[in-house]
């Protein structure tokens, strides 16, 4: 089969023929039609995870066929039986085991789910990792409630967009942030109430003046600007962190947290229950993933460059065997 191989970190990905995967007990092989990219794949290419052993086939998201049926795969393996957190055996498709950027991939049989009927395969390939992460952050951890006001940071990325779509479906009042005015306007066209440019000095003061405080924040950046998120929170608000692309949180005033009874919660990926509930939400509200661009398989490096640029609005998808 053909697979996209990372042979060393920070080197061009090459497409080569490798042996078909051989499933072990309780595993099956899925024929991949489309695969979706995530920032995780870029970070693996750059060697930013511990214990990476090259050569490597990355990719956590896919839509394909199994026994002639259209399927997608929950990329969160071995979560365990406790809903509050993952087990010590938890892993994500695409590291350390070979992932979705190949014509075939072996996965646990229990991870296979039917492709939602209203979705095309390329849309299905956009959904699993980002949709699961967004669902858990917004609903399982954030406990989003209809009528609440939510700020979703970094709009344009896959998780942020799914969080926005899910929040809108549930009847929340959605606000977004970005450093790109075009992305803000696109989000507003999709239903967001308004957006702010976090590069603007004292944006948080303007936000509260114009829109009031928020009850919930969904953030994947952290970093030096995190303290401003606290400042726009209403009493008893929740801030859910699902990523840390901007690094350490260094400017945080404890009194602003405990006096307003604010909860700061961590969230990553999700359980099998989260995944099933996410699919139910997507099907009930006929939600379609936002796709930025679909690349042919032989343009895998161009797809990674697009992801690295940060210019995308929505998911980047590869046509493996469309």
Labelled PLM ranges:
Residues 19-36, 46-85, 94-99, 116-118:
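Glycine-rich beta-strand-centered segment in the early N-terminal region that forms part
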Residues 76-154:
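NAD(P)H dinucleotide-binding glycine-rich loop of Rossmann-like/cofactor-binding domains
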Residues 72, 215-218:
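N-terminal Rossmann-like NAD(P) cofactor-binding module of classical short-chain dehydrogenase/reductase
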Residues 90, 170-172, 178-181, 221-290, ...:
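Glycine-rich phosphate-binding loop and adjacent beta-alpha segment
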Residues 150, 211, 286-290, 301-322:
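C-terminal capping/lid region of NAD(P)-dependent oxidoreductase domains
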Residues 33-34, 76, 110, 244, ...:
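Short, surface-exposed secondary-structure boundary micro-motifs
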Residues 202-212:
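Short amphipathic alpha-helix with an adjacent loop that forms part of the alpha/beta core around
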Residues 68, 122-200:
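Mid-domain Rossmann-like dinucleotide-binding core that forms the NAD(H)/NADP(H) cofactor-binding site
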């Amino acid at each position: 089969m053909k697979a996209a191989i990372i042979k060393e970190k920070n080197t061009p990905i090459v497409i080569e023929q490798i042996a078909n995967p051989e499933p072990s007990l309780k595993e099956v092989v899925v024929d991949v039609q489309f695969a979706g990219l995530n920032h995780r794949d870029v970070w693996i290419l750059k060697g930013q995870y511990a214990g990476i052993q090259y050569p490597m086939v990355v990719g956590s998201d896919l839509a394909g066929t199994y026994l002639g049926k259209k399927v997608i795969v929950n990329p969160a393996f071995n979560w365990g039986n406790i809903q509050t957190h993952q087990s010590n055996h938890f892993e994500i498709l695409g590291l350390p085991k070979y992932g979705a950027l190949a014509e075939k991939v072996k996965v646990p049989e229990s991870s296979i789910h039917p492709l939602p009927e209203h979705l095309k395969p390329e849309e299905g390939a956009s959904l699993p990792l980002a949709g699961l992460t967004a669902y858990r952050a917004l609903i399982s951890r954030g406990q989003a409630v209809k009528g609440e006001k939510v700020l979703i940071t970094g709009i344009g990325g896959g998780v942020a967009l799914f969080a926005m779509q899910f929040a809108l479906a549930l009847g929340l009042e959605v606000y977004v942030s970005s450093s790109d005015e075009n992305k803000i306007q696109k989000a507003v066209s999709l239903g967001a109430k308004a957006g702010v440019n976090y590069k603007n000095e004292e944006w948080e003061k303007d936000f509260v003046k114009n829109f009031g405080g928020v009850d919930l924040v969904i953030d994947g950046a952290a970093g030096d600007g995190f303290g401003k998120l606290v400042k726009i929170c209403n009493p008893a608000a929740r801030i859910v962190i699902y990523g840390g692309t901007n690094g350490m949180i260094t400017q945080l005033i404890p009194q602003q947290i405990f006096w307003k009874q604010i909860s700061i919660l961590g969230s990553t990926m999700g359980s099998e229950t989260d995944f099933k509930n996410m699919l139910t939400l997507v099907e009930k509200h006929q939600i379609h993933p936002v796709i930025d661009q679909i690349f042919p398989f032989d343009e895998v490096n161009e797809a990674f460059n697009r992801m690295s640029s940060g210019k995308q609005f929505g998911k980047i998808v590869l046509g493996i065997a469309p």
